[in-house]
């Protein structure tokens, strides 16, 4: 796994995470719809996800960046938590907002470790802004370990993505 490929894989996976968890923050003026008393935005309005209109299609798309079973687990959790809803042939994502300083932070790929048998671990340093600070002065840095291996198609994919939990 070359560094440039690892960076590209992490960037794509992180962008997908932003799409699924921070859609409300980046709505671009789109008006939410109310489904079952909760506000949602159509996932199809989110750029590169514009041809995805079902949870199954999203799982297939995620399979380029995440192991199939892990992608399925993430989407199942999103549907269960009502962050993701299929309605009238359209896939909607919750119009959620997050704490004011949670958007301010960054990351850096520090290291690629061999884990044996064609598996790797990306060591990524994540940092977050201090509470209420929007000037990019970071209060905490944390190393997070992301396991990577090849899928059946021979593509490197994440078998877990701890950023999903720690960055929320």
What kind of feature is each model-predicted range?
Residues 1-93:
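Core segments of small alpha/beta cavity-forming domains
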Residues 3, 25, 56, 69, ...:
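Glutamate identity and glutamate-enriched acidic tracts
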Residues 83-131:
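Surface-exposed, charged secondary-structure patches
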Residues 127-141:
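Short, cysteine-centered beta-strand-loop-beta hairpins and adjacent loop/turn segments enriched
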């Amino acid at each position: 796994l070359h560094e440039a490929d690892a960076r590209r894989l992490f960037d794509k996976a992180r962008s997908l995470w932003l799409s699924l968890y921070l859609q409300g923050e980046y709505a671009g003026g789109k008006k939410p719809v109310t489904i079952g008393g909760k506000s949602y935005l159509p996932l199809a309005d989110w750029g590169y996800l514009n041809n995805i209109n079902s949870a199954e299609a999203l799982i297939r798309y995620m399979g380029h960046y995440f192991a199939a079973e892990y992608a399925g687990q993430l989407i199942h959790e999103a549907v269960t938590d009502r962050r993701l809803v299929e309605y009238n042939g359209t896939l909607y994502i919750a119009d959620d907002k997050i704490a004011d300083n949670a958007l301010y932070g960054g990351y850096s790929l520090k290291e690629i470790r061999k884990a044996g048998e064609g598996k790797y671990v990306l060591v990524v340093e994540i940092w977050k802004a201090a509470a209420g600070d929007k000037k990019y002065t970071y209060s905490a840095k944390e190393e997070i370990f992301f396991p990577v291996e090849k899928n059946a198609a021979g593509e490197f994919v994440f078998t877990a993505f701890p950023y999903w939990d720690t960055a929320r």
